[in-house]
């Protein structure tokens, strides 16, 4: 049986709609009928066919890894799922036999493969993944929100890396993940949450999500904002979401002594860092990749159930046949999360 999918078909700019074979389920897998998918920044990289994509992405391949769907098939070894369960899923498929997997630190698996990055992804009518990777969506959480659990998980993993209660938090990069991280920080009790970017549309989105200050660093100085807020000692926690070298070095300069920094944004490989800031301030730096399995997923559900409102971050919806409009909108930078509806 053939199904509709969005695939990287050629080693050049673009993503195309095509027909592929319906994926076959193994003994430990679930077959999921996709309801909604969201476009990730990674999908935009794949669309643009940048240097990272050229080195990483096999062609042809079905792309996409942010989704919500319904279980329609269950492998014979699988327990704990029933037909009709609403699920999203962890996009990092791990080996299960390396030291970190066996030690319960699966997010640090050295043999990780990515759904929609190294193997066929979720931008299709059906997806097969190991049942281990599926996460049941609690009742009361909408399909829209469930479809963005993957990037929300990046935000939660990064934001909750350090204690935020009563702390001053600086977030560099107001993409959807940075904005969601800011909302999490506010929700769990940070004092001042300041986010920086040069994209005024996204800074406005951050303001709607309740940040203390959204700062356009093209025309406002961070130190002025700090003194306006009565901050005399620098930020306690930094969350770097942009991958922009000047943003990271500006963050290091703005941190308090003993501050803690989590890095999610991927910088150029030759980024220069002012290491004296790190050494003399005694900063702690932590790299973040993906989500903790599955601690982050349970935290995400609990945060939404406890009143965290992420709905403003979802700005655009398109039918799957209008996927090109969705990608154009994401590439313009004038959007939050863009959702594609498969039903």
Swiss-Prot record:
Q: Which cofactor does it need?
A: Zn(2+)
**Is the Zinc keyword given for this protein?**
yes
Task: Please write the reaction equations for the catalytic activity of this protein.
Answer: L-threonine + NAD(+) = (2S)-2-amino-3-oxobutanoate + NADH + H(+)
Site description Important for catalytic activity for the proton relay mechanism but does not participate directly in the coordination of zinc atom, residues in chain: 150
Q: Where is the active site?
A: 42 (charge relay system), 45 (charge relay system)
Give the location in the cell. Cytoplasm
The cofactor note reads: Binds 2 Zn(2+) ions per subunit.
Kindly state one GO CC term assigned in the UniProt record. Answer: cytoplasm
Instruction: Determine if Zinc is one of this entry's keywords.
Output: yes
Primary localization: cytoplasm
Instruction: Choose any GO biological process term that the UniProt entry carries and state it.
Output: L-threonine catabolic process to glycine
Enzyme Commission no: 1.1.1.103
Q: Which protein family is it in? A: Belongs to the zinc-containing alcohol dehydrogenase family.
Subunit architecture: Homotetramer.
What's the protein called, per UniProt? L-threonine 3-dehydrogenase
């Amino acid at each position: 049986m053939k199904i509709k999918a969005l695939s990287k078909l050629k080693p050049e700019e673009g993503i195309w709609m095509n027909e592929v074979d319906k994926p076959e389920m193994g003994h430990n897998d679930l077959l999921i009928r996709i309801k909604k998918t969201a476009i990730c920044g990674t999908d935009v990289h794949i669309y643009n066919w940048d240097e990272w994509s050229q080195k990483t992405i096999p062609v042809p391949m079905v792309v996409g890894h942010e989704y919500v769907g319904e279980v329609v098939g269950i492998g014979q070894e699988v327990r704990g799922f029933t037909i009709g369960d609403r699920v999203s899923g962890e996009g990092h498929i791990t080996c299960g036999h390396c030291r970190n997997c066996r030690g319960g630190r699966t997010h640090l698996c050295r043999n990780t493969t990515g759904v929609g990055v190294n193997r066929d992804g979720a931008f299709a009518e059906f997806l097969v993944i190991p049942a281990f990777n599926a996460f049941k969506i609690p009742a009361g959480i909408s399909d829209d929100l469930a479809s963005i659990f993957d990037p929300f998980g990046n935000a939660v993993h990064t934001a909750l890396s350090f204690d935020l209660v009563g702390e001053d938090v600086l977030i560099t990069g107001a993409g959807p993940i940075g904005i969601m991280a800011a909302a999490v920080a506010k929700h769990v009790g940070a004092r001042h949450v300041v986010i920086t970017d040069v994209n005024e549309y996204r800074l406005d989105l951050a303001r709607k999500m309740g940040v203390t200050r959204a700062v356009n660093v093209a025309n406002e100085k961070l130190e002025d904002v700090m003194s306006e807020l009565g901050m005399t000692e620098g930020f306690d926690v930094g969350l770097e979401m942009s991958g922009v070298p000047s943003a990271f070095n500006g963050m290091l300069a703005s941190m308090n002594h003993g501050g803690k920094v989590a890095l999610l944004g991927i910088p150029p490989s030759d980024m220069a860092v002012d290491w004296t800031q790190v050494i003399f301030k005694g900063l702690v730096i932590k790299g973040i990749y993906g989500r903790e399995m599955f601690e982050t997923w349970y935290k995400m559900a609990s945060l939404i159930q406890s009143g965290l409102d992420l709905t403003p971050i979802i700005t655009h919806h398109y039918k799957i046949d209008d996927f090109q409009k969705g990608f154009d909108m994401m590439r313009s930078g004038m959007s939050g999360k863009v959702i594609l509806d498969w039903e």
